[in-house]
Amino acid sequence: RVGLYSKRGRSRIEAARSALRDAGFHGQSDADLRAARTFAMAEPDGSDARKAADELDFYAASGARDFLFHAEEHELSPAELADMTEALGLRVLGLELTHSDAASLYRQRFPDDPAMADLRRWDAIEAEHPDIFRHMCQFWCVSSGV
């Protein structure tokens, strides 16, 4: 099982991070983290900082610190994941879908792929629906030789 953050899916979080950094928050102490969350909640609906409050992790200190002030995070597109799995000789078995519309969107667009395991096709879906892997892109793979 592999889980990675999606570039498109995390764009709203990156915007929130940037807004909080610009406001002077760094999340290095509990007090700074609480102040950053208070600031975000006081911002107008729809603002970049306020969008952080749409995430469940926002409401727990460890989760908020991780998603808002993570020291180093690598984000990839499903197409980049496809390149990586192919280069490593891996075959994708399937994805763990958390977005309620993900499976129906894929099946409507690609009815010939009942396994829904083509990362390049998922990239096309995500291009149209950037929040589909908002939390994480998780998938199962095996060696191509198996």
Per-segment meaning from a language model:
Residues 1-50:
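Conserved class I S-adenosyl-L-methionine
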Residues 33-146:
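Rossmann-like AdoMet/SAM-dependent catalytic core
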